[in-house]
């Protein structure tokens, strides 16, 4: 597995296409959720992704600077390609994303995610704690979760 870290400006255009395709495959097609994925946050975000030995993007996450979606740094668009699931790749993806977020910004900062409710327990294993009530985002139940690095 090869890991890549980029700003929007430094993303190779073929990789940008591949990660947008992966996001669409999972969030729109697999989850049967019609929504606008391109939300104008990608340009100011940091992009972390993994490619398999064939060079295909199989995991992706974006890091949003504090003040973009939340007062804190946030991690979103967490995706692992279907054939790459069940191999702890999602855990490695999140750990790498958290470390990069804390390196980019203040290590003491909390990290916020908007988690699909069916993944609360999975994110909980990584140290995230649910906040507030469940809500619908694009017809899918979600909860805000926060991980403190204090």
Predicted regions and their residues:
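Conserved GNAT acetyl-CoA-binding A-motif
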Residues: 94, 101-116
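Conserved catalytic-core motifs of GNAT/GCN5-like acyltransferases
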Residues: 112, 124, 129-144
């Amino acid at each position: 597995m090869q890991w890549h870290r980029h700003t929007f400006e430094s993303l190779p255009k073929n990789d940008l296409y591949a990660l947008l395709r992966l996001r669409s495959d999972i969030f729109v097609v697999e989850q049967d959720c019609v929504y606008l994925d391109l939300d104008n946050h990608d340009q100011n975000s940091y992009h972390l992704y993994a490619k398999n030995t064939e060079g295909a993007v199989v995991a992706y996450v974006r890091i949003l600077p504090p003040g973009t979606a939340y007062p804190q740094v946030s991690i979103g668009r967490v995706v692992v390609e279907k054939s790459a699931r069940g191999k702890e790749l999602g855990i490695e993806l999140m750990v790498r994303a958290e470390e990069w977020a804390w390196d980019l910004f203040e290590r003491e900062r909390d990290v916020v995610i908007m988690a699909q409710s069916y993944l609360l327990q999975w994110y909980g294993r990584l140290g995230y704690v649910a906040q507030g009530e469940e809500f619908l985002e694009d017809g899918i139940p979600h909860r805000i979760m926060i991980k403190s690095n204090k």
